[in-house]
Amino acid sequence: MNILQGSEAPLSYEEIASRAGAFDFNKNIPLKNWLRTSTTISKQAHVYVSEHDYSNGVFLLFRYCELFMKCQKHPDAAAYKKELFDYYQGVRNALEEIELIKPIVKEQYEQYQCQKNDLDDLKKLSMKDSQPSLEKPVSYVDEPILEQWALSDLQILPPSSTDLLSPDSQKLSKSSSDLPQFDYPSLNSSPTFNSNLPISSSRFEKTSLSDSKLVSPEPLDDNKDIQFIKKPIYTRTSEPRPKPAGTFKIHAYTEGGKPLRTIYLPKLLKKVFLDVVKPNTKKNLETCGILCGKLRQNAFFITHLVIPLQEATSDTCGTTDEASLFEFQDKHNLLTLGWIHTHPTQTCFMSSVDLHTHCSYQLMLPEAIAIVMAPSKNTSGIFRLLDPEGLQTIVKCRKPGLFHPHEGKVYTMVAQPGHVREINSKLQVVDLRVK
């Protein structure tokens, strides 16, 4: 499943090369936010690679490198020299991984094209041999997507393949004269540097599309924990070669047509959160929590509810020790998938403060959600900014004061069949306020 277009058909190496750098980089957004975004991208890339979905993995690795190029030119760069140097070390590792993956990605795309051409030839031959008829010709269309959610969402699909080293993407091969801070390696040949993190080429053993076949997954029992397909362990000499992991299908898209990967939300999360923050709610103080989880087979699973250190009023709340939060997330290899907060006495909506807060979450991860709990009204809602209209409105907003209106519709409720699905699954609550 291609995360760029939400389809099974892969893009070419050249196509994804041009798209890897095609994202908005707003210098008005604090550099610390972009650096955190880079960490999110890197984590996702390595999940895809570990699941043998090399095309999505290499796309994200290249976007990780592209983002580094832009971060160097951010107005706050001078204040983040150490962080940028650490980022550069990550880029070196990413480039080495790209070089190892490149031949596999190219071969997979070539195999896909050969299979597609063969199928097209068969269709033409079939149409040619058919008898003339006054009836309308048969239309070859895909089966309609099932509207009802089911674990048929999970199917084995050949990994979409790309080629990221196109002539148009050689901007990453800039010389050290263009980038005075760093000696950026060339992408045209295998790197000659020593990486801090050794990478075994056995991780990228070639996987033939012809070796893949559909496998029916075990059904998901709502009364049991989420079950993931296990990744095969293999070495260079292992037989048979590893097959691609199952992939959760895309069911929702942004207003701009970009695919949104599904987020699986524990049904008990809202109730658990209200129970944890009840003391603050009684004092008419807002409380927020961070929704953390894992990326598995092209879908996100919320596994942790983290309550960070924070300060709050009746109308606002904000974290005060982000370093501890990030340390916990990195230690457990968790992604930030959104946030949840209360409106103790108000109704369920997104205030202007909420919109600006959520903007940073959604820039970091397009699928990120905001859950608002209004206990006094016994209501709740799951929201996201409209993309691109609402997101750009908030990014460009320079209105003074915490509370101010925004023109037009800025956000929407994530309604079925949106990209959020509630399921019976375990949830771990971590309260960082407790020492």
UniProtKB/Swiss-Prot annotation:
It is found in: Cytoplasm; Endosome. Residues 162-181 have a biased composition (Low complexity). A motif (JAMM motif) lies at residues 341-354. PROSITE patterns: MPN. It is an enzyme of class 3 (hydrolase). SUPFAM superfamilies: JAB1/MPN domain (SSF102712), USP8 N-terminal domain-like (SSF140856). Zinc metalloprotease that specifically cleaves 'Lys-63'-linked polyubiquitin chains. Does not cleave 'Lys-48'-linked polyubiquitin chains. Plays a role in the multivesicular body (MVB) sorting pathway. Required for ubiquitin-dependent sorting of proteins into the endosome and subsequent trafficking to the vacuole. May regulate MVB sorting through deubiquitination of ubiquitinated ESCRT proteins. This is AMSH-like protease sst2. The gene is sst2.
